[in-house]
């Protein structure tokens, strides 16, 4: 009896750009041998809007509303880097009170970003319950943002030399209440997730990256620290008032998806501690106390000094950038967010180069998914934590 010859052809699957596990308009062309991934080709650019070229045709003040559309889940960091770059270039001083506000707001944004990473990540690997839990705390953070800035997500709050407005009446107390409330909730997530046997089966040993490999690929943020490299720009660059807070860099040695989860959970706790410490020592205290002292002591009292202001001075709409170049970076939730700025004595930047952490971290995806099962792509991509607005710019 003649047997028919068996043919083995690879299967090509297109994942995205509208698949919910892609976390935005990312497309992956995946080549499969049965259930095993043999090749993965990411297709980017669906959300490209020319953000760098837009910056070169706008003043810094005009450009600020645009930057919240990069990483729209952690907008305080994109605003921070946008004002930090011209501040460093022009050597503009920031009052101490404004600097503390510029620590509190991004750390709240970091907590919100990590929470919104955790929920969809768990949903990707089959656990729906945490997705609903995280929105409880995230909504509280957005209420704080709305009270301080008027907007829940696209804040347009940072300014060259400080922030747009001071914290409103009663805001410091509400923020302190949130910190006291949120720490037990993060511990609740850990009890619910970390030792769950099904969760561990899906993430332990999946998508492993070594420390040297992570450095060679230019990874940053939790992706780098989960591979055993103790590198956090808040400690390295000593910007704003982070040196005046007592907190620890979160690091894991394993380099897998579980390690990246552990780093982000640990960072959420540390961010709460940073906010709590900043609220206690912010110059002038709560806004209502500062205003009462100013009214009581008179116009020329020390409570009207530079360090108690929320902005050094409001910049001119035609603020000119000196003819210099500078690279500024901050530790965003996803990694090192940087701006290379070149000025030419005009109100418009000559060059505005963005270093997006999500784009750099995403480079390693094809290597990580090669040889794994198709279902593990969701785990690995979710553990990288990307926002396509930042990746495509």
Curated annotation (Swiss-Prot):
For this protein, what is any one GO molecular function term? NAD binding
Q: What is its EC number?
A: 7.1.1.-
Gene Ontology CC entries for this record: chloroplast thylakoid membrane
Q: Which UniProt keywords apply?
A: Chloroplast, Membrane, NAD, NADP, Plastid, Plastoquinone, Quinone, Thylakoid, Translocase, Transport
Pfam families listed in its UniProt record: Complex1_49kDa (PF00346)
SUPFAM superfamilies from the entry? HydB/Nqo4-like
Q: What is the name listed in the Swiss-Prot or TrEMBL entry for this protein?
A: NAD(P)H-quinone oxidoreductase subunit H, chloroplastic
